Amino acid sequence: MQIKAEEISKIIEEQIQSYEQRVEMSETGTVLYVGDGIARVHGVQNAMAMELLEFPGGLMGMVLNLEEDNVGVALLGDDTQIKEGDPVKRTGKIFSVPVGDAVMGRVLNPLGQPIDGLGPLDAKEFRPVELKAPGIIARKSVHEPMPTGIKAIDAMTPIGRGQRELVIGDRQTGKTAVCIDAILAQKNTDIHCFYVAIGQKKATVALVADTLRKYGAMEYTTIISATASEPAPLQFISAYSGCTMAEFYRNNGKHALIIYDDLSKQAVAYRQMSLLLRRPPGREAYPGDVFYLHSRLLERAAKVNDSLGAGSLTALPIIETQAGDVSAYIPTNVISITDGQVYLEPNLFNAGIRPAINVGLSVSRVGGAAQIKAMKQVAGTMRLDLAQYRELAAFAQFGSDLDKATKAKLDRGARLVELLKQPQYEPMPTEEQVASMYAATRGLMDDVAVADIRKFETAMLDYLRSGKADILNDIKTKKALDQDIENRLKAAIAEFKKGYQA
């Protein structure tokens, strides 16, 4: 085989032409101090706020403090392998998480990595965790109902799509239970649900995931978990990660519901980080921007106007109070940000009234516009009836002789309280709630013993479902009680009572 000189020179020429010099530029710094999930890094002069820095071993850190000679970094993971003098590299990326249908039905950590053992995520899109909330022009007032399946809430503190309704109460009063029921109630709707567990026990998160799987709700739910053993920066950022994933649906003309369980623990994690970053402490040692911490998160829940797709993101933040003190710093902050609150009380819980909702202190500031007409018709006077009942019950304890009208009000109130009790994991469809409340508020249950009210209600709804399903369907489709439906419902209940044996 003969090699020609011109061939060799041609090959060499091609090689020279295709030769490309690659220089990888990266700005690096050095760890000055590390501990408690916080690092101080010197030398990354051009780092941006919220930028990710890469530490040895692939650990990421998020820039929070930009100071004259160093930056304060929150480490998003275990800091035991990081030591003073370690090199740190700028990534030039802002902290982002995966979004889209790939996250549905998964359990993720705040970085968007799966922790459920079901394999990697097939995410096509990533979004930054810190995004601006929609402006005034982009919004529309809340007007569509988002039923929770809980009678006391849907009747008296209704929630609309795009609303922020706070669930507040002491520990062990059923706050998480109310929110899990709200997720279960979305089973046959178009709402995608997100549950953010902040600072919870791992066993609690596992129980929530098992419950959602058992009731077939996991297929439209994503759990973002930053448990109590995770570093404070992960607990702080988890709410924003979950919000970004949920916002994807809002921005694409769909509907989402997000539960933050709970924001008290997020505030504690943020306080820890801020103190370690040497930011000045304020009231209760929280930093001055703890209000902004929660307001910028909850303002991202919104009902978007029609030109932007008419999507919505509804938020149910949870706050844990200490001994019923709703006037503490964090509870008052979040109450002032949200559009109403559901207040759960230990005394009611211990008295067997579950869900333990205090009807007097619970309000929904915008949900009234979202409540369907049928519910307004049957439950309009309910709050007043219960308020009068509580007042009269306190008065009746003195054992004075009561006139007929007062006694009737007391009897009606006792039946309403009994009717509003509901077992866990059994959300009730709106049309069944309407039928049940109609019977109670129109006096059709006045001759049923208080102890038998729930038994009577169950039997009555079974009867309506099996024999008079057309009435329930009409309530569902018309969303109002016209004279015809009311007459048929009244007749059906009267017919049922004839054959009912308590």
From Swiss-Prot:
Q: Does the keyword Nucleus apply?
A: no
Q: What GO annotations for molecular function exist for this entry?
A: ADP binding; ATP binding; proton-transporting ATP synthase activity, rotational mechanism
Any idea where this protein resides?
Cell inner membrane
Disulfide bond entries: none
Keywords, comma-separated and alphabetical: ATP synthesis, ATP-binding, Cell inner membrane, Cell membrane, CF(1), Hydrogen ion transport, Ion transport, Membrane, Nucleotide-binding, Translocase, Transport
Top EC group = translocase
- According to UniProt, residues marked as the site described as Required for activity are S362
EC number(s) for this protein?
Answer: 7.1.2.2
Reaction(s) catalysed (UniProt annotation): ATP + H2O + 4 H(+)(in) = ADP + phosphate + 5 H(+)(out)
**InterPro entries attached to this UniProt entry:** ATP_synth_asu-like_sf, ATP_synth_asu_C, ATP_synth_asu_C_sf, ATP_synth_F1_a_nt-bd_dom, ATP_synth_F1_asu, ATPase_a/bsu_AS, ATPase_F1/V1/A1_a/bsu_N, ATPase_F1/V1/A1_a/bsu_N_sf
List the CDD domains hit by this protein, alphabetically. Answer: ATP-synt_F1_alpha_C, ATP-synt_F1_alpha_N, F1-ATPase_alpha_CD
Membrane as a keyword of this entry, yes or no, is yes
Where is ATP bound in this sequence?
A: G169, D170, R171, Q172, T173, G174, K175, T176
Its assembly, as annotated, is: F-type ATPases have 2 components, CF(1) - the catalytic core - and CF(0) - the membrane proton channel. CF(1) has five subunits: alpha(3), beta(3), gamma(1), delta(1), epsilon(1). CF(0) has three main subunits: a(1), b(2) and c(9-12). The alpha and beta chains form an alternating ring which encloses part of the gamma chain. CF(1) is attached to CF(0) by a central stalk formed by the gamma and epsilon chains, while a peripheral stalk is formed by the delta and b chains.
Q: What is this protein called?
A: ATP synthase subunit alpha
**Which organism is the protein's source?**
Nitratidesulfovibrio vulgaris (strain ATCC 29579 / DSM 644 / CCUG 34227 / NCIMB 8303 / VKM B-1760 / Hildenborough)
